[in-house]
Amino acid sequence: GESERFENVLTELFGLEPDAVGALRLVASTGSVIGMSRTYNSPDGKAAGTFGQGLPAIRSSEMISGTEPRRIIFLSEDSDSRANVGCVNGSSEDVQISLAMRNARGELLETRTMALGPYSNNQINRIFRDYQPVKGYVDVSAGSQSAFYYCYGSMLDNATSDPTTILPQVPSADTTFIPAAALAAGLAGAFFSTDVDLNNAGATSLTYRLLWLPRGVDNSNPVQSQQFSLAAGAG
């Protein structure tokens, strides 16, 4: 099917000027439309190109419903990085969203509340500012069964403001893949490496390994890491 891309969509479609921030709602005649967005930083003079993060268009079936919590991991606040958490209300009713901030040991640091009106959205910048240096995560939840919303995290490099999108997760018994990892040179002097953050969202301790799957080869018998453990609620 046909695709269409809108560059700098807030200016192209809505004629907005700086400083405009918010969310977009996609309304279509059928359910067959899919979408993707990229929000990016353009450094002065663009000598270094752009730094940005992608966010997919979230379907109604992927929104967070009711009181079941979701976890946003891989958040940090220190001299190198900062973390933001944003939420959007997908319904015509007000919603109160609780954001329980925890450190990597699972200890509760603070619970903040985000109140959103119908179809409203907001973002808490540098959510762990008062607890730096810290690595942690945020559990988002609502107190009403009628709640219908979505939250995301964003980790930014303090030197470049290069952001990384972090989507909310729930534990699953399914096999889990991290579909890309790198330790390799790129174009124009770039060099890519991969950080991984793992979290135990269950009620019992667990052990795990990571398996290395090199690109373009048969990985039926992959190289395995040593075994690690995570206590219940830790990350």
Describe each model-derived feature in a short phrase.
Residues 1-235:
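Gly/Pro-rich, tryptophan- and cysteine-flecked surface segments typical
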